[in-house]
Amino acid sequence: MATALPRTLGELQLYRILQKANLLSYFDAFIQQGGDDVQQLCEAGEEEFLEIMALVGMASKPLHVRRLQKALRDWVTNPGLFNQPLTSLPVSSIPIYKLPEGSPTWLGISCNSYERSSSAREPHLKVPKCAATTCVQSLGQGKSEVGSLALQSVSESRLWQGHHTTESEHSLSPADLGSPASPKESSEALDAAAALSVAECVERMAPTLPKSDLNEVKELLKNNKKLAKMIGHIFEMSDEDPHKEEEIRKYSAIYGRFDSKRKDGKHLTLHELTVNEAAAQLCVKDNALLTRRDELFALARQVSREVTYKYTYRTTRLKCGERDELSPKRIKMEDGFPDFQESVPTLFQQARAKSEELAGLSSQAEKGMAKQMELLCAQAGYERLQQERRLMAGLYRQSSGEQSPDGGLPSDGSDGQGERPLNLRIPSVQNRQPHHFVVDGELSRLYSNEVKSHSSESLGILKDYPHSAFTLEKKVIKTEPEDSR
């Protein structure tokens, strides 16, 4: 996976350290977690350092951690090894990606800027002398060789390279960086493009701000002597006074104010610089915000959120040659939650579709169970029917044996009726009918209603047999006329 190029000086320092430790594969992980402050890595305690290592995925590789620790120690003791003696430079405030590739300038500074005198009024920032070939050629043979930092072309290696030409270092003032006017006590400020974005956002927000009553402000200052002593003179200055803006910037700063207990050498980040600039611009529009720092801080953060994203996206697209393109993402809104409201119908439709799918699956399962029960019942009924048929066949054979002429009926001579005529023998045959009806009643009680349709045929055979026998006998028997004696 290709490693992204550093875009700020803080990222460049991290890039050089990881390059020294041969750990460039972790560069993207550090940037994604916001680890572009090398000083934070150096000052972190044991627990904090291990937590950072876990965030970037290095905790499971102790040898990589040791290599990084060694590179950090080398960076602290001998930063010259990394070509980065940038101890007094704002780490995250100067974007590098504004430079087009192959440009002989660095952050809008021409090669001649490095030859300026070091006796300027403003505090100076030291920059490394990593020379580009175009800069060296433009200077001439008689001048001292001085370099500037430049990107290599895309076809070559993506590494940041440069070479030292002399041991001396030239100075660079904030004015050379294109930063707007700022108090002389501070060397940290936004560049002109970011400050312009802040001013535009404040101009859009100014009409929506509530108007402050000057009498209320004066009453507040009268009751608060300490606050009046600090900022009371600002309200007495006229708008044409050139020192009024400087005083407003001095007392409106949210981060790194002159009376704060910030550690020496701890530089402001890009977010903090943006918030300070927004607070200053807001206080210039409405001086009364100096007395309401809570409200000022909230408004400045709102401006910073909008400006930071838009400015970062704009400068990134400028590097790719796509200018004046609007941001494709939606800026976070303070008033409502439209994204949540739009997602509710979608979630409802998804839940409804899932419920319909579950209902369909449950109906299929019920149908399958019903079919299985039907098959089991059919099998049980078939087995019961077979048993009934076997039983009926046995009863039928038994009844047939009793009615057979060979030995099924008892002889008439045994009853002493051998001399009687045939018509007198009929009652003896009819006396046997209740026996068959008793058998029929017992069979009907043996079986359930489920198999009546199947057993009716067998029972019908058993019922009809004796009646048919009686009918045949009646046809054969001829009654004799009584003797007329």
From Swiss-Prot:
For this UniProt record, give its keywords in alphabetical order, as a comma-separated list: Isopeptide bond, Nucleus, Phosphoprotein, Repressor, Transcription, Transcription regulation, Ubl conjugation
User: Site of the Glycyl lysine isopeptide (Lys-Gly) (interchain with G-Cter in SUMO2) crosslink?
Assistant: 126, 129, 143, 211, 332, 354, 367, 371, 452, 463, 475, 478
- The source's domain of life comes to Eukaryota
Please note every region of biased composition (Low complexity).
Answer: 403-414
- Where does the record place the region NCD1? 4-82
Give the position of the cross-link Glycyl lysine isopeptide (Lys-Gly) (interchain with G-Cter in SUMO1): 332, 478
Region annotation Disordered: where it falls in the sequence: 160-188, 398-431
A GO cellular component annotation here is: nucleus
**Residue positions of the PTM Phosphoserine?**
171, 182, 327, 404
Q: Where is this region: NCD2?
A: 220-309
Provide one Gene Ontology biological process annotation: negative regulation of DNA-templated transcription
Q: Does the keyword Ubl conjugation apply?
A: yes
Cell location:
Nucleus
Q: Any notes on this protein's domains?
A: The NAB conserved domain 1 (NCD1) interacts with EGR1 inhibitory domain and mediates multimerization.
> Which protein family is named in the record?
Belongs to the NAB family.
Q: How does it assemble?
A: Homomultimers may associate with EGR1 bound to DNA.
Q: What does this protein do?
A: Acts as a transcriptional repressor for zinc finger transcription factors EGR1 and EGR2. Also represses multiple types of non-EGR1 activation domains (in vitro).
Designated name of the protein: NGFI-A-binding protein 1
Lineage of the organism: Eukaryota, Metazoa, Chordata, Craniata, Vertebrata
